[in-house]
Amino acid sequence: MARYTGPVTRKSRRLGTDLVGGDQSFEKRPYPPGQHGRARIKDSEYRQQLQEKQKARFTYGVMEKQFRRYYEEAVRHSGKTGEELLKILESRLDNVVYRAGLARTRRMARQLVSHGHFSVNGVHVNVPSYRVSQYDIIDVRDNSLNTVPFQIARETAGDRPIPSWLQVVGGRQRILIHQLPERAQIEVPLTEQLIVEYYSK
């Protein structure tokens, strides 16, 4: 399945949640697109579970096959499956770049990582799905620091709260991973138990 690259606002309206964060177009019309968008549709249990899974996929920009692999990995962990799934998604490098305020959206963060702007523990990494670990150090590469995206990030630092499990240091925009997040530290409008129920059928 190809990655969705269409209008994000339309997808947000279809799933009933702001997938970007601060999407003014969605806030103006938070109902599904199309002629009958305002019509009430009776939610079946399956539809609710599917919709929650799709919300998670599009929030983090993950394709179906990869999302299923994340779920299967979460099942093998000792904690609650839904919470473990969210921890895996949060530990992706593109999400960490977004959470640290170095990109306005996860889609932009994915592009920055893909274009080779970051190193992890001194090693160049250009894979958005790369999984960070506790005590990792993520740096913007020297030749990228003065490019427009990172200049904007420095100017807008503080506009969005940074989660307590990571820290951004000074003008170099270095990201320190103090720990991997607990569920209470993950602010996403998702009911992960519905995703577990979807895959448990």
Curated annotation (Swiss-Prot):
Where in this protein does the record put region Disordered?
1-42
GO terms (molecular function) for this protein are:
rRNA binding; structural constituent of ribosome
InterPro entries per the record?
Ribosomal_uS4, Ribosomal_uS4_bac-type, Ribosomal_uS4_CS, Ribosomal_uS4_N, S4_RNA-bd, S4_RNA-bd_sf
Q: Which Gene Ontology CC terms are recorded?
A: small ribosomal subunit
Q: Which UniProt key words apply to this protein?
A: Ribonucleoprotein, Ribosomal protein, RNA-binding, rRNA-binding
GO annotation, biological process: ribosomal small subunit biogenesis; translation
S4 RNA-binding domain: residues covered: 91-157
Q: Which family does it belong to?
A: Belongs to the universal ribosomal protein uS4 family.
What does this protein do, in the record's words? One of the primary rRNA binding proteins, it binds directly to 16S rRNA where it nucleates assembly of the body of the 30S subunit. With S5 and S12 plays an important role in translational accuracy.
Q: How does it assemble?
A: Part of the 30S ribosomal subunit. Contacts protein S5. The interaction surface between S4 and S5 is involved in control of translational fidelity.
Name of the molecule in the record? Small ribosomal subunit protein uS4
Q: Which organism is it from?
A: Mycobacterium ulcerans (strain Agy99)
The gene it comes from is rpsD
